[in-house]
């Protein structure tokens, strides 16, 4: 297990307050949303994995914002496609 220090991760984010927010957000993605870790898990908890990802420069607040925007757009597109399919079925009397 690689040792993770907050100081190393702070250098990537800018300050420790933003680090807490980014790490918590990423740990939640890993633990609750089932996102795949970008580093080896090595039996680490989601918070440690999140800190390791941040320390290695793989995760940032901007990256997660962009990722969430893409997922939101994909969700909206599939909802629109479902509504269009229902509307089309209704128009043809199915």
From Swiss-Prot:
GO MF term set: DNA binding; DNA-directed RNA polymerase activity
One Pfam family matching this protein: RNA_pol_Rpb6
Positions of disulphide bridges: none
GO biological process entries: DNA-templated transcription
EC number: 2.7.7.6
GO CC field: DNA-directed RNA polymerase complex
Catalytic activity: RNA(n) + a ribonucleoside 5'-triphosphate = RNA(n+1) + diphosphate
Protein keywords: DNA-directed RNA polymerase, Nucleotidyltransferase, Transcription, Transferase
Subunit architecture: The RNAP catalytic core consists of 2 alpha, 1 beta, 1 beta' and 1 omega subunit. When a sigma factor is associated with the core the holoenzyme is formed, which can initiate transcription.
Similarity field: Belongs to the RNA polymerase subunit omega family.
UniProt protein name: DNA-directed RNA polymerase subunit omega
Organism: Tolumonas auensis (strain DSM 9187 / NBRC 110442 / TA 4)
Taxonomic path: Bacteria, Pseudomonadati, Pseudomonadota, Gammaproteobacteria, Aeromonadales
Originating gene: rpoZ
């Amino acid at each position: 297990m690689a040792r993770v220090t907050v100081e190393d991760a702070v250098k990537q984010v800018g300050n420790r307050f933003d680090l807490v927010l980014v790490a918590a957000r990423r740990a939640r993605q890993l633990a609750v949303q089932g996102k795949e870790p970008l580093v080896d898990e090595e039996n680490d908890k989601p918070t440690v994995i999140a800190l390791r990802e941040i320390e290695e420069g793989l995760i940032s607040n901007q990256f997660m914002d962009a990722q969430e925007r893409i997922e939101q757009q994909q969700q909206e597109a599939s909802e629109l496609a479902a509504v269009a399919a229902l509307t089309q079925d209704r128009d043809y009397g199915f």
